[in-house]
């Protein structure tokens, strides 16, 4: 069932259930104690996506029940950050009265930040012409008196930008402000306050670690930028072109001078490290100049393939960030042949759902 209305009195119970479930699932890896990081019980999501339903003169957001596929009208959305919730209502009020903006509109996406920016993407089953551009400009001017708001219009083979296609998040991590560009249609952690807790936990892990860090699946540099100060050098890989572009932007904004990002998949990087293939994308980067004793991986829900697990197992210390306990368990079966779990944390990125974000710290066994 989609989470729309929230009874905050149930928050502690649902988190306790997750803690017990994960503790039981990973007990065989010697996990004695979980570190548990809670979320805000309401208004925690910085992004939200809705379909749009037209009913005569009426117009409203909808979601679909995951089991029955029935549509659910969404006039207010309790998980949404306050800025998203407020702008949702403002958008509906303004779209209802504008035929040009509402016609053939089928989806609205919201992306916001703790620092007060919001990007609204409007998706259409029609080409966007000069009349649409005129109306959306008028709306942007009207709303900009109160909000730091930009718009994107999307139609088939068409993208119109009214402002930027990204927001700039500013996170206070252990007293340091970190700046992150977050681009429309690119992955970012939806629960910004829990993301801060994840970054602070990772920084704590890295305090005693030395030499260099390798990160696979680095996204927009979320972890590597926060951890760069703990290491001599950081090398990070990411396959998404837009995420690599954002990571480079974020490196410059945060004045990080010891971090290199290369655009390649974990499988390709494994081939490069094993000397199986050479890549022009590695030109100017001497892999042998890095003394990486720590590796951080934050893979997609599918986890890591066997060859990547083999590569990861070569490092003294492993930080594994996971959004899927099932593939994490599978990969730990592989990694605990050579390493032992030292710390295990859960982060409630997605309250009131079965989803859970985990962080595991492993160190090589003494032989």
UniProtKB/Swiss-Prot annotation:
PROSITE patterns: SAM_MT_RNA_M5U, TRMA_1, TRMA_2
UniProt entry tagged with the keyword Methyltransferase: yes
Sequence positions that bind S-adenosyl-L-methionine: 189, 217, 222, 238, 298
GO biological process: tRNA methylation
GO molecular function per UniProt: rRNA binding; tRNA (uracil(54)-C5)-methyltransferase activity, S-adenosyl methionine-dependent; tRNA binding
Catalytic activity: uridine(54) in tRNA + S-adenosyl-L-methionine = 5-methyluridine(54) in tRNA + S-adenosyl-L-homocysteine + H(+); uridine(341) in tmRNA + S-adenosyl-L-methionine = 5-methyluridine(341) in tmRNA + S-adenosyl-L-homocysteine + H(+)
SUPFAM superfamilies: S-adenosyl-L-methionine-dependent methyltransferases (SSF53335)
Designated name of the protein: tRNA/tmRNA (uracil-C(5))-methyltransferase
Lineage: Bacteria, Pseudomonadati, Pseudomonadota, Gammaproteobacteria, Alteromonadales
């Amino acid at each position: 069932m989609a989470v729309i209305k929230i009874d905050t009195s149930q928050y502690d119970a649902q988190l306790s259930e997750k803690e017990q479930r994960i503790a039981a699932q990973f007990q065989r890896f010697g996990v004695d104690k979980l570190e548990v990081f809670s979320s805000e019980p309401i208004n925690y999501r910085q992004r939200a996506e809705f379909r749009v339903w037209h009913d005569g003169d009426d117009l409203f957001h909808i979601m679909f029940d995951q089991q029955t596929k029935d549509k659910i009208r969404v006039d207010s959305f309790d998980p949404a950050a306050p800025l998203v919730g407020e702008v949702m209502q403002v958008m509906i009020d303004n779209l209802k009265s504008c035929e040009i903006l509402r016609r053939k509109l089928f989806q609205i996406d919201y992306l916001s930040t703790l620092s007060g920016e919001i990007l609204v993407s409007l998706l259409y089953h029609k080409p966007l012409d000069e009349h649409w551009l005129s109306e959306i400009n008028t709306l942007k001017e009207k709303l900009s008196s109160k909000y730091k708001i930009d718009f994107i219009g999307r139609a088939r083979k068409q993208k119109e930008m009214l402002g930027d296609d990204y927001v700039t998040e500013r996170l206070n991590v252990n007293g340091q402000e970190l700046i992150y560009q977050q681009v429309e249609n690119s992955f970012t952690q939806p629960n910004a306050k829990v993301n801060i807790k994840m970054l602070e936990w990772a920084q704590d892990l890295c305090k005693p670690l030395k030499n260099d860090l390798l990160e696979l699946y680095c996204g927009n540099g979320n972890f590597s930028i926060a951890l760069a100060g703990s290491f001599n050098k950081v090398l990070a890989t990411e396959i998404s072109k837009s995420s690599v572009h954002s990571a480079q932007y974020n490196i410059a904004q945060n004045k990080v001078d010891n971090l290199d990002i290369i655009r390649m998949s974990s499988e390709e990087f494994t081939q490069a490290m094993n000397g199986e293939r050479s890549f022009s994308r590695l030109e100017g980067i001497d892999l042998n100049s890095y003394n990486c004793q720590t590796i951080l991986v934050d893979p997609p829900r599918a986890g890591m393939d066997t060859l990547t697990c083999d590569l990861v197992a070569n490092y003294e210390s492993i930080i594994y960030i996971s959004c899927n306990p099932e593939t994490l368990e599978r990969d730990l079966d592989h990694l605990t042949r050579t390493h032992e779990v030292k710390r295990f944390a859960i982060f409630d990125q997605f309250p009131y759902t079965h989803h859970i974000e985990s962080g595991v710290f492993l160190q090589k066994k003494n032989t």
